[in-house]
Amino acid sequence: MASKLCDSCKSATAALYCRPDAAFLCLSCDSKVHAANKLASRHARVWMCEVCEQAPAHVTCKADAAALCVTCDRDIHSANPLARRHERVPVTPFYDSVSSDGSVKHTAVNFLDDCYFSDIDGNGSREEEEEEAASWLLLPNPKTTTTATAGIVAVTSAEEVPGDSPEMNTGQQYLFSDPDPYLDLDYGNVDPKVESLEQNSSGTDGVVPVENRTVRIPTVNENCFEMDFTGGSKGFTYGGGYNCISHSVSSSSMEVGVVPDGGSVADVSYPYGGPATSGADPGTQRAVPLTSAEREARVMRYREKRKNRKFEKTIRYASRKAYAEMRPRIKGRFAKRTDTNESNDVVGHGGIFSGFGLVPTF
């Protein structure tokens, strides 16, 4: 599609659109028309669409760095989901006159918002960023020394120390010498020879006295429970610790597979009270495993009981049985009774039950 021609000269390609005049103008005609008077120089103008070059630009796509009209913006950014995520801003109109000497590129940056494209010709800002990054990489001044010894942090420099007296130098060497790069955590036994050598090399013996002592791991853990399954008839015994209880469980019951009764568990001693007694009677005996003869006797008794069982037919609901016998039947099935039949049935069967006050049971 051919580009849109200028509405003024009708020969050159239109480069911008004047909104107050509603006219497409080329660069030369724009400079002539809008430089005529002060009122014309205030006209807001926008660039042409960079895709179709037929309509004025409406938005600026920051991802594509292109000014687009409404139609091209809809067609391009609805093609796929990735294009829909492009950030777009409205076109900012400009009021300066545009010269036709090849400065269109520079003016295009002005019509696009400078806050979004500040790094196009920003050599100064790039230099500032490089200087800021280099400031983080600068090494500290060798004349300035920061030391930390025995909890004291001090900064000494050549400019801050007035004079070079031997007394001051001696004090600095005595107070602010180089610290040991490793911390002494005082774990385990330390060789006295190595320790004295480190203290002499550091030169900080007179600043803060360090008490070297051996940290011993406690051998007895509090709140511990000892389970003794080695056997024997010993009960629960007090282990001697503050909160440590030693449990000794008899394993004779575990060997035969029978749960012991309450008498097999002995007393437990507690530090804050008297001995805890079991709920069972201490005079009761433990369960003894059955012998083969006793087991055979039990099996025989069970078999005798099973043989002597009686399966007799008993009438559980006598009243229901009597009522079922009174109801009329047709071919063995119950039939509906009419009023006359009901009266006849009552009269006919009245003599049978006349001598009984209750429903008979069979």
UniProtKB/Swiss-Prot annotation:
Alphabetized GO MF terms: zinc ion binding
Q: Per the record's keyword annotation, is Transcription regulation included, yes or no?
A: no
Q: What is the official name of this protein in its record?
A: Zinc finger protein CONSTANS-LIKE 4
Where's it mainly located?
Answer: nucleus
List the GO cellular component terms: nucleus
- The residue ranges of the CCT domain are 295-337
Family, according to the entry, reads as follows: Belongs to the CONSTANS family.
* Top-rank taxon: Eukaryota
This protein's UniProt keywords: Metal-binding, Nucleus, Repeat, Zinc, Zinc-finger
Q: Which residues does the annotation say bind Zn(2+) 1?
A: 6, 9, 29, 34
Q: What Pfam families does the database record attribute to this sequence?
A: CCT (PF06203), zf-B_box (PF00643)
- What is any one GO biological process for this UniProt entry? regulation of flower development
